[in-house]
Amino acid sequence: MSIFSRIAGTGSYLPELRLTNQDLVERLAKTGLETSDEWIATRSGISARHFAAENELTSDLALKAAQAALSSAGITSSDLDLIILATSTPDHLGGFPSTACVVQDKLGAHTACAAFDVQAVCAGFTYALATADAFIRTGSYKKVLVIGAETFSRILDFQDRGTCVLFGDGAGAVVLEASSEPGILSTALHADGSQRDILCVPGRSGNGAVHGSPFMTMDGQAVFKLAVKVLEQVAHEVLAKANLKPEQIDWLVPHQANIRIMEGTAKKMGMSMDKVIVTVHEHGNTSAASIPLALDCGIRSGQIQRGQHLLLEGVGGGFAWGAVALKY
């Protein structure tokens, strides 16, 4: 008998500190950087974002989202076989121990539960979900916790108006479990390392020092142009694998990078924005957390219902992109 995977539960978490555009404008003005609510909103669709407290780590955000997802699925951490965490802002310099291992400990999961991180920036959750699905299909694991969590505020240059107004912190999680009926229908992952410089943190660490900038940089125009192109391509690819057409998709749950990218992708897919889950206005770009955050919000709002077909897609630094078609 074939083994499939399905989403059994979802959860999300946002840090307590919420900054509206005006809050951020006033904060930046104190450092001599000028911007405006209108400038931010018209270019990105963002009205607010959340920032982690100084003592909050990526694992703390991930833990809250994970606990909510476990509760939603009706299981406990002792039921888990594997934890996969997508992040570009791990707890530890160098990325080890993995933030997934930290979350495993904080959850109280047993040592039989494997744990590791994946890193594909804003496409990270699609990579993590596709990996979890593959593990379940092989019969290796039955219950996998998949998390996307970021504290991007830690790597923002608050003298760079083009990036510091766009990003926020948060976490989202799903419990993926083995099923006799298909839930995840198809996945597709891609990367183009030749485009690595258009969205990156250029600095490198060595001998106890950081060489180059420790903050993210972005060529916004290049990212926009490439993102819309590859998102359309991977969406068609993953739908073809699932034998679905765009009109059969009930909800598009995209990476919440920028309202213009989401509108551009929906238009190319021939989909109305009424069928797109949009949270970027309240969350900003939360990188690997954005898709599971949007998914959980769509479910909790009652928009997304069991039995509906969803298309998840994301694109990020690397350049990396991916998509997942599923029946919720």
Swiss-Prot record:
SUPFAM superfamilies for the chain: Thiolase-like (SSF53901)
First-tier enzyme category under EC: transferase
Renumbered residue ranges of the record's region ACP-binding: 256-260
Catalytic reaction list: malonyl-[ACP] + acetyl-CoA + H(+) = 3-oxobutanoyl-[ACP] + CO2 + CoA
Subcellular location: Cytoplasm
A GO BP annotation: secondary metabolite biosynthetic process
Protein family per UniProt: Belongs to the thiolase-like superfamily. FabH family.
Role: Catalyzes the condensation reaction of fatty acid synthesis by the addition to an acyl acceptor of two carbons from malonyl-ACP. Catalyzes the first condensation reaction which initiates fatty acid synthesis and may therefore play a role in governing the total rate of fatty acid production. Possesses both acetoacetyl-ACP synthase and acetyl transacylase activities. Its substrate specificity determines the biosynthesis of branched-chain and/or straight-chain of fatty acids.
Name of the protein this chain belongs to: Beta-ketoacyl-[acyl-carrier-protein] synthase III
Gene that encodes the chain: fabH
